[in-house]
Amino acid sequence: MAVEELQSIIKRCQILEEQDFKEEDFGLFQLAGQRCIEEGHTDQLLEIIQNEKNKVIIKNMGWNLVGPVVRCLLCKDKEDSKRKVYFLIFDLLVKLCNPKELLLGLLELIEEPSGKQISQSILLLLQPLQTVIQKLHNKAYSIGLALSTLWNQLSLLPVPYSKEQIQMDDYGLCQCCKALIEFTKPFVEEVIDNKENSLENEKLKDELLKFCFKSLKCPLLTAQFFEQSEEGGNDPFRYFASEIIGFLSAIGHPFPKMIFNHGRKKRTWNYLEFEEEENKQLADSMASLAYLVFVQGIHIDQLPMVLSPLYLLQFNMGHIEVFLQRTEESVISKGLELLENSLLRIEDNSLLYQYLEIKSFLTVPQGLVKVMTLCPIETLRKKSLAMLQLYINKLDSQGKYTLFRCLLNTSNHSGVEAFIIQNIKNQIDMSLKRTRNNKWFTGPQLISLLDLVLFLPEGAETDLLQNSDRIMASLNLLRYLVIKDNENDNQTGLWTELGNIENNFLKPLHIGLNMSKAHYEAEIKNSQEAQKSKDLCSITVSGEEIPNMPPEMQLKVLHSALFTFDLIESVLARVEELIEIKTKSTSEENIGIK
């Protein structure tokens, strides 16, 4: 019945001119053709499409059948013989139908699926889509629309993380990336071959450029890469990245020029639209490009060999900042790798303090601190700590001094502050061992820095448990200074400032320890009484109530806190003992001299 209906509609339309086809004819053709497909009359439908007499009708109306045919092809339960006929019908429709209508129809079909069906749809439709676009005159608009639609769908797919996931490619992203390169190549070649640089060719370049930058952001920003020595040829993302960077050069945007122009006042693009997009969207793409070139070494041979390590570091710091602002493990990891790659090219103590006037040279170490303190992944926390130390090592003395002040003022984390204080101690030690003192870690400059170290933020009421790492590091630094610097020499300026240190740090610390120990001892007593009654209870630590827990666990927490206070108290007592010994010894020496 469906076949007869379709033949009747076609017979009526055969006698009409193309411009006389009515909207009603299109609707009836679509309904009858769709029923033929649903009822399995595919052989008869194929004959109708192949009939030369129906060529004009198929050209104008046939695109309505593409959707039903494609949906049948995407169904895995069809017999092989049926699938073969569906493919023949589909190929004929692509060959015969109006390319403008086909383009929109194919893009709608690409947008329909979700989940794992996204890649199946794309892999099926890429080749026909390429064929259709090559028939159109306005290629720039068409390729732009197609690439944008394809990228939007691919960006919905999860990026495989491990080697096993990449090999399994459950969602088909890796296959799609490879197929997308093959889809795009003819249009890149068309740009290369067109020597006239017509307006249409320039527009095509721009659309390809947009696609390349979108691809650098997704999937390449989060994609993992094999080691080059390990199965490098089988790494789909390395292949995709290499081709995308190659496309950039081929369409007249070699990546060295692009990455070194990024962020400058001089505009990189010819069109305002691109300039606005660069400012808002392309930071991730540029960071991804820098990582691919400098860490993965993709097309690195195109870079000028004369670039200095300091220049490359300055260039990369903005991109590292972008990486560290993200939360994905793979993206943060890339930022750390790029930072390490850039820093290892530079000699220790050679990074001048003036570089810290550049915003990213301060925001990157602050970003490292955030990863160290907030990231849930231990390997990234440890790597960030190592990178912060490496960064400190590269700075000159004034740069180290400036960075220490900055991080002490901004980190708000006892462990980080303890780490900085240990670095300050190391710099003082190196300075005292030199024949010529380093002015940044001796005398007035050091005293100014010690003002940020040897004090309690809230005086005697400071939470000593929460600040225990910082306090212990500060006491150890003070003990070191008392031992190493004689009062008569006073190279560090410590002995001049000792009165202030005692008033601002040592005395409040004594009071705070007494208050804290009394509080925790009272809590231990309460917990022991609760243990006798075998009830759950709550305790207050640092002004906050700890959730209900068994009394045995509470006692462990409380005794651990008391142990920390005892440790601080013992170091404090030793520091005060050393001060007394040194002061007395100096007084006796001075009396002897007289």
Swiss-Prot record:
Keywords (A to Z) from UniProt: Acetylation, Disease variant, Phosphoprotein
Disulfide-bonded cysteines: none
Residues recorded with modification N-acetylalanine: 2
Tissue: Ubiquitous.
Region span, Important for interaction with RBX1: 300-594
Pfam families listed in its UniProt record: Kinetochor_Ybp2
Residues covered by region (Alpha-helical region with structural similarity to HEAT repeats): 2-553
GO cellular component term of the entry, any: cytoplasm
Consequence of substituting residue 425 to A: Disrupts interaction with RBX1. Loss of inhibition of SCF (SKP1-Cullin-F-box protein) E3 ubiquitin-protein ligase activity
Gene Ontology MF term list: hepatocyte growth factor receptor binding; signaling receptor binding; ubiquitin protein ligase binding; ubiquitin-protein transferase inhibitor activity
Post-translational modifications reported in the UniProt record: Phosphorylated on tyrosine residues.
Any Gene Ontology biological process: neural tube closure
Stated consequence of mutating residue 574 to A: Disrupts interaction with RBX1. Loss of inhibition of SCF (SKP1-Cullin-F-box protein) E3 ubiquitin-protein ligase activity
Subunit structure: Interacts with FKBP4 and FKBP1A. Isoform 1: Interacts with RBX1 (via RING domain). Identified in complexes that contain RBX1 plus one of the cullins CUL1, CUL2, CUL3, and CUL4A. Identified in a SCF complex composed of CUL1, RBX1, SKP1, FBXW7 and GLMN. Component of a SCF-like complex consisting of CUL7, RBX1, SKP1, FBXW8 and GLMN. Interacts with unphosphorylated MET and is released upon MET phosphorylation.
Domains as described in the record: The C-terminal half of the protein is important for interaction with RBX1.
Disease linked to the protein: Glomuvenous malformations: Characterized by the presence of smooth-muscle-like glomus cells in the media surrounding distended vascular lumens.
Name of the protein in question: Glomulin
Gene coding for it: GLMN
